Structures are given as C-alpha cells and as structure tokens.
Design a protein with these regions (language model features):
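Polybasic (Lys/Arg-rich)
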Residues: 1-83
Length: 83
C-alpha cells in the first residue's frame, strides 16, 4: 500500500479539542487558534499513518509530504473497502 521509507520526523497539528490532552504528553507549540503542533520521530510511514488516523479529524499531518500522501492513500483504500 505504501513504502516503509520515510523522513526522520513528522509534524502533526492537533485540534483545539484535544490540544490540552496532547500537550500533557508531548512537547510542542500552541497556535493562535488553540491547536497544538508536535514534531514526532518517524522511523516508518506505516506507524505515522496509524498514529495520525487514530485521532480522526482531530489530527492533521503537516509534514513530510510522503506521510500526507500515504494517509490519503490509506483513506482511499478505506473508502473503496466501504463501497
């Protein structure tokens, strides 16, 4: 489905709805809208996809572009499986 190769880091924006919970567990920066941005280590795109998707619409991968593409691909596969 997607390659295991990736960058060493991913940047994820968490929604204001879960920002406080994430901030209690991770180092990052708040944005003006209340969202929270974290740079996570990323050894494998598959892990990154699973990590971001577990938060549904409350998380957005900002980088690397390969991760964003892999998430889109995973979502297309899910949509096709659901008919």
């Amino acid at each position: 489905m997607f390659s295991a190769e990736s960058s060493d880091e991913m940047t994820v924006r968490y929604s204001p709805r879960i920002a406080r919970w994430i901030a209690e567990r991770e180092d990052g920066e708040y944005e003006a809208d209340g969202s929270f941005v974290v740079r996570h280590p990323l050894a494998d795109l598959r892990w990154g996809v699973r990590h971001v998707l577990q938060y549904g619409t409350d998380a957005e991968a900002l980088s690397p572009p390969e991760l964003r593409g892999a998430i889109g691909e995973a979502l297309r596969h899910m949509q096709a499986a659901l008919g």
